[in-house]
């Protein structure tokens, strides 16, 4: 039996330190008239923190779970039901095809940068091209809302999978955590949008030789789609010993998003595009998604070693890049059509990995 290792966590905050962090949300002088009310709310929040009220609203799991009496988070249960509904629709051959286009840049004109991103323009080209397909619905997910939208958050992955795969639940049950104030987690909605799609197109810039933080946050939180446990009651929530025992007895590592097709548009200005494109394609391949052909995996420089200030003008002038981006969209549309008709070639689909993980 594997041993659960302890000793890293520094422990709970003091009452004073907790209060400082809580009150930091109310530094605007406009809140001064409500200091007494804020103090009462602080005490409620402190009690929730001290007593670990992660999921204050629960209900019995019910039939179909390993422990039907286990008190599951109502919020998690509702997310799960939405995913099951989206999956049923996605697998129904009578429904319209759906492609999720994701703008992965952090920049937009609604906050500090003051200008839209080139990535958004490229994602819009993808959306425009897909829009010409009669049987395709397009869903545009703009991750820059993390930087400009009130309360938008993708909390970081806590790494449960490294303790044991069954401790990582599908969908993620780490959030919301009301005791720690870790709420408004966007991933509950994002999981549903991935599940609903037949095709995915990621459009991303390169930040410091790699993907932007909004995209990395989403990638990490999608680990539960690759081997995640759909039954939190089997591990009594977050019991690491039970999860380790369950994995050691044999775990199937279910790929909850496998079989969808994908395309990539990666752009940069001086370096890093090939490594970023490779990292993303390897990640999607690992999760069981299918690339839409060589033309669907694009990496290009825009305004190579030119000033940042004129990079939009450089994009304006690169007509060939515009057409290459359109070809990514066309390749994905073609792949979705072939996939849903059962005609997409997948020579390795019957193979089983000798090293499942």
Across the structure, where does each feature detected by a protein language model lie?
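Helix-loop-strand module that forms the ligand-binding subsite of alpha/beta enzymes
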Residues: 3-52, 75-88, 173-287
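Short, contiguous, helix-prone interaction/anchoring segments in small proteins
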Residues: 95-104, 115, 126-128
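Short beta-strand segments enriched in small/hydrophobic residues
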Residues: 97-109, 263-266
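A short beta-strand-loop structural module common to alpha/beta enzyme folds
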Residues: 134-147
């Amino acid at each position: 039996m594997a041993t659960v290792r302890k000793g890293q966590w520094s422990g709970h905050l003091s009452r004073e330190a907790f209060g400082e962090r809580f009150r930091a949300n109310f530094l605007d002088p406009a809140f001064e008239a409500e200091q007494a009310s804020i103090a009462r709310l602080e005490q409620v929040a402190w009690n929730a923190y001290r007593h670990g009220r992660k999921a204050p609203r629960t209900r019995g799991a019910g039939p179909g779970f390993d422990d039907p009496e286990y008190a599951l988070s109502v919020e998690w249960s509702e997310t799960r039901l939405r995913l099951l509904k989206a999956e049923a629709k996605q697998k129904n051959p009578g429904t319209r095809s759906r492609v999720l286009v994701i703008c992965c840049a952090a920049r937009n004109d609604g906050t500090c940068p003051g200008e839209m991103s080139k990535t958004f323009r490229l994602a819009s080209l993808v959306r425009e091209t897909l829009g010409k397909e009669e049987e395709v619905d397009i869903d545009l997910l703009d991750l820059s809302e993390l930087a400009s939208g009130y309360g938008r958050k993708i909390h970081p992955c806590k790494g449960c999978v490294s303790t044991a795969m069954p401790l990582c639940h599908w969908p993620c049950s780490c959030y919301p955590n009301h005791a720690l104030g870790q709420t408004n987690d966007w991933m509950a909605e994002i999981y549903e949008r991935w599940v609903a799609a037949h095709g995915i197109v990621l459009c991303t810039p390169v930040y410091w030789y790699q993907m932007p933080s909004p995209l990395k946050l989403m990638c990490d939180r999608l680990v539960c789609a690759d081997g995640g446990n759909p039954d939190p009651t089997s591990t009594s929530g977050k019991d690491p010993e039970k999860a380790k025992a369950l994995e050691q007895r044999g775990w199937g590592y279910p790929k909850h998003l496998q079989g969808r097709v994908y395309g990539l548009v990666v752009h940069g200005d001086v370096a890093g595009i090939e490594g970023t494109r490779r990292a993303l394609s390897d990640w999607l391949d690992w999760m069981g998604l299918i690339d839409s052909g060589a033309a669907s995996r694009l990496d290009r420089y825009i305004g190579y070693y030119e000033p940042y200030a004129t990079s939009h003008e450089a994009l304006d002038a690169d007509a060939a890049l515009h057409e290459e981006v359109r070809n990514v969209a066309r390749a994905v549309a073609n792949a979705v059509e072939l996939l849903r008709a059962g005609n997409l070639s997948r020579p390795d689909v019957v193979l089983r990995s000798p090293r499942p993980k």
